[in-house]
C-alpha cells in the first residue's frame, strides 16, 4: 500500500435483533383498510390504503403499533428525506403506496397474506430507526 492510500471500511446499515413479530392477519380491522397487502420490508412497510379509510387506518394502526412503529404519509416520509436528497424517481409514488411505517423498536410486522402464512422469522433484520441500525462503524487504515 502506498503512503498516500487510505482504506475505508464501513457498512450500509446495521442490524437489530427481532424482539417481537406481528402479522397483520391478526388485525382484520387494519386489513380492511388496505387495497393490497403491505409490502417492502418487515421494519419499513408501505401500505396502499383505501382513500375513504385513511383516517380509520391511521387510528387503527396507531392504536396497536404506536409505540413500535412510526406511521406517516408517503408525502411526510419523502419530505423527511429518508431516501436521500435529489430528484424523486418517477415511479416512487407507485412503489411506496400512500403510507409508510418505520420500526422504532425491536419489532417487525411479517409480510404475510392468507395465501402465504407462517413464514419463518429471521433472528435479526434492518430498515428500522433504532441506533443499532442507523449507526455503523467506520474504519480507516493508513500505512
What are these regions (language model features)?
Residues 1-143:
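Feature captures the catalytic ectodomains and active-site-proximal regions of enzymes
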Amino acid at each position: 500500500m502506498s503512503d498516500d492510500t487510505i482504506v475505508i471500511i464501513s457498512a450500509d446499515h446495521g442490524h437489530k435483533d427481532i424482539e417481537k413479530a406481528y402479522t397483520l392477519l391478526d388485525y382484520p380491522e387494519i386489513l380492511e383498510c388496505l387495497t393490497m397487502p403491505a409490502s417492502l420490508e418487515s421494519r419499513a412497510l408501505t401500505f396502499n390504503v383505501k382513500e375513504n379509510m385513511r383516517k380509520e387506518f391511521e387510528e387503527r394502526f396507531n392504536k396497536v403499533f404506536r409505540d413500535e412503529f412510526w406511521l406517516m404519509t408517503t408525502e411526510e416520509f419523502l419530505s423527511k428525506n429518508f431516501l436521500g436528497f435529489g430528484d424523486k424517481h418517477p415511479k416512487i409514488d407507485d412503489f411506496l403506496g400512500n403510507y409508510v411505517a418505520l420500526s422504532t423498536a425491536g419489532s417487525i410486522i411479517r409480510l404475510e397474506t392468507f395465501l402465504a402464512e407462517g413464514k419463518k422469522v429471521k433472528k435479526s433484520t434492518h430498515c428500522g430507526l433504532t441506533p443499532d441500525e442507523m449507526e455503523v462503524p467506520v474504519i480507516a487504515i493508513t500505512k
